[in-house]
């Protein structure tokens, strides 16, 4: 995996998220099933019984109870008549101007935002630990066992967080599938971040982690070389450390080459979906629902 391509995907994902969470909500005037929230319509009835008698004298009792209609994602309806009429037209729900109560249907709210927050915290901790260790080594102090253990834990947590974020987004989509099959805007946002976390996890395990481990080994060799009194042996260790730090890990194979081109091609995804949602918001074309 090539670093710059992954970084471009990450930048595009952040930009697209800002667009979806800010401009997109402002752009949409229609609160039908294309908005970022999730609600369902629930008719508010009092429980009543109506008794009727047919021609044969049979008495029939009809009980009217509160009825929940199928999920109808909207932004914030809150009993607004215009909003509920749009929901009625899209989903075929007949509310007939009865009182409407809107309640959330999502089991997991904003999985993409949760993922961004968790990954950001873990990356921040990882960067702080690495910078602290590098500064410690540059100052002439050896890295302690605790520091190396802490770096190892953060390396493991970073990969686990990236891989777990993909699983979390998939589970959230499955859990709220009735909502996401109608609200493609939120679905697109979640799928996009799941894709980004996936390529970050692959890039991390195949490129970033080996490179970082190699750099740390090179720095440790330099520190050890300074403690060796034999000048020739110390020089050899410094040369080895320099080579270890700068030589490529391995020549890219066929899989890496194909993956690089596919990731480059996938960069077109971000402008394509942005143009699509702008067109939907401005009413230039109907959403795909």
From Swiss-Prot:
Membrane topology note: Multi-pass membrane protein
Segments passing through the bilayer: 1-21, 112-132, 151-171, 189-209, 261-281
Keyword annotations of the record: Host membrane, Membrane, Transmembrane, Transmembrane helix
Keyword Membrane attributed: yes
Keyword Transmembrane helix: yes
Subcellular location: Host membrane
A GO cellular component annotation in the UniProt record: host cell membrane
Protein name from the UniProt record: Putative transmembrane protein ORF111
Organism, scientific name: Ostreid herpesvirus 1 (isolate France)
């Amino acid at each position: 995996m090539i670093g710059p391509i992954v970084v471009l995907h990450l930048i595009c994902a952040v930009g697209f998220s800002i667009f979806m969470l800010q401009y997109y909500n402002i752009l949409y005037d229609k609160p039908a099933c294309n908005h970022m929230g999730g609600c369902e319509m629930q008719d508010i009835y009092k429980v009543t019984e109506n008794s009727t008698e047919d021609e044969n004298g049979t008495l029939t009792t009809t009980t009217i109870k509160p009825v929940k209609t199928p999920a109808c994602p909207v932004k914030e309806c809150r009993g607004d008549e215009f909003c509920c009429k749009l929901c009625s037209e899209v989903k075929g729900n007949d509310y007939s101007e009865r009182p409407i109560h809107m309640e959330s249907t999502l089991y997991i709210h904003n999985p993409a935002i949760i993922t961004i927050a968790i990954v950001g915290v873990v990356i921040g901790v990882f960067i702080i630990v690495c910078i602290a260790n590098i500064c410690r080594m540059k100052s002439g102090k050896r890295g302690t066992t605790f520091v190396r253990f802490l770096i190892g834990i953060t390396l493991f947590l970073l990969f686990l967080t990236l891989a777990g974020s993909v699983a979390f987004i998939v589970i959230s989509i499955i859990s709220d599938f009735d909502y996401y099959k109608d609200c493609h805007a939120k679905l697109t946002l979640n799928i996009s971040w799941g894709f980004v976390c996936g390529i970050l996890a692959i890039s991390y395990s195949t490129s970033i982690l080996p490179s970082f481990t190699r750099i740390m080994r090179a720095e440790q060799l330099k520190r050890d070389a300074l403690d060796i009194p034999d000048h020739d042996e110390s020089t050899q260790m410094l040369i080895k450390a320099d080579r270890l730090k700068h030589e490529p890990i391995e020549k890219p194979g066929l899989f890496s080459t194909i993956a690089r081109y596919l990731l480059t091609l996938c960069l077109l995804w971000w402008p394509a979906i942005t143009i699509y949602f702008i067109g939907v918001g401005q009413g230039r074309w109907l959403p795909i629902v």
